[in-house]
């Protein structure tokens, strides 16, 4: 429950962005909070996730149009999560998305450092890395302080992620708690050598943590690319079909998490994630190099994928510097670069698909 989580953060003196205090249930409520918060803002589903149930309002738009968008969110949330309540929150269009991995057993609370998840499309993460290139020791201490204090207040039991936004002035704002294992857990496991899946199961069985904070060290750098069945040339439109050929990468510092096999049908009704490819190295540069190699070795035929997108992304100046933010795709020319002839070959149909 995003609203209740933010209320608890405020009680703990953890900064949050301006937001409506309760769910918006009428046009009158909507007008009130639009007047108080002002654009840019986002309409957010109270129990949404994975980029579902969120709409950004940036420019000139009527209250009636906003209300129509809100009704669309309610319909979407009813079918996806069985809940229709939403709220309004100030929007940071050029932010860093940071998160802290927490492990708790109700009495003991440990952190496994931070991750960065700023590379997104439609509010859903595409690439994650640990640690964050944007976080120095002072900021790391603040992130961890906020996350641990929140976990203690909740008497948290399980693996969980406490998510934050960082603005251009280095101000932190609590966003939400994800009380489960995240898609991006492999990058944290790579730099800490802690098996989060195992600990989630052990805590769920009632076991107490047998490690302390001193046992958790970070070493190296890990970057994960989410390989999706979607076409970047068509604004990441889903691409259903049958997997006709599959070649997965390997080698030192490369990890692959996937369920794929040749002949498998990919349907348009579910999340488009096909595989997670992780590059690990002693430094960020080495992790990037290994991820580049791994992505070049990967072959997925039968559906369009975002592999060509990552081929361009990993050469971009902002990514290499670590300065990219949540609106990087929108403000950069990266999708225009995908239209170059070299990249377009990846989207050409096979000869068997061409009819006279």
Language model features: what each stretch is:
Residues 1-48, 53:
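A conserved helix-loop-beta module that forms one wall/lid of the active-site cleft
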Residues 12-13, 50, 58, 63-356:
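ATP-dependent carboxylate activation and anion-phosphoryl transfer catalytic cores
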């Amino acid at each position: 429950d995003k609203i209740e989580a933010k209320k608890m953060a405020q009680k703990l003196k953890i900064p949050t962005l301006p937001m409506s205090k309760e769910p918006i249930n009428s046009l009158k409520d909507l007008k009130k909070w639009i007047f108080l918060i002002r654009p840019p803002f986002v309409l957010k589903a109270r129990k949404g996730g994975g980029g579902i149930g969120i709409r950004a309002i940036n420019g000139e738009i009527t209250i009636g149009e906003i209300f129509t968008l809100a009704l669309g969110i309610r319909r979407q949330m009813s079918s996806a999560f069985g809940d229709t309540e939403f709220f309004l929150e100030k929007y940071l269009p050029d932010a860093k998305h940071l998160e802290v991995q927490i492990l708790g057993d109700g009495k003991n609370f440990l952190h496994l450092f931070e991750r960065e998840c700023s590379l997104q499309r439609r509010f859903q993460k595409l690439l994650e890395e640990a640690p964050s290139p944007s976080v120095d020791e002072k900021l790391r201490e603040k992130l961890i302080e906020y996350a641990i204090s929140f976990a203690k207040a909740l008497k948290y039991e399980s693996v969980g992620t406490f998510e934050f936004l960082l603005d251009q002035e280095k101000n932190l704002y609590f966003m939400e708690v994800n009380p489960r294992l995240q898609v991006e857990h492999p990058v944290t496991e790579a730099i800490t050598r802690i098996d989060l899946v195992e600990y989630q199961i052990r805590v769920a069985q009632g076991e107490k943590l047998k490690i302390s904070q001193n046992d958790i060290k970070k070493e190296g750098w890990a970057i994960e690319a989410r390989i999706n069945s979607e076409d970047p040339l068509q604004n990441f439109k889903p691409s259903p079909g049958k997997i006709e050929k599959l070649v997965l990468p390997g080698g030192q510092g490369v990890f692959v998490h996937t369920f794929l096999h040749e002949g498998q049908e990919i349907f348009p009704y579910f999340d488009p994630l096909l595989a997670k490819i992780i590059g690990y190295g002693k430094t960020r540069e080495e992790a990037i190099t290994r991820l580049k190699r791994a992505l070049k070795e990967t072959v997925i035929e039968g559906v369009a994928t975002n592999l060509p997108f990552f081929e361009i992304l990993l050469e971009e100046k902002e990514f290499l510097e670590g300065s990219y933010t949540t609106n990087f795709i929108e403000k950069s020319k990266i999708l225009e670069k995908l239209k170059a002839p070299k990249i377009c070959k990846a989207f050409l149909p096979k000869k068997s698909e061409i009819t006279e």
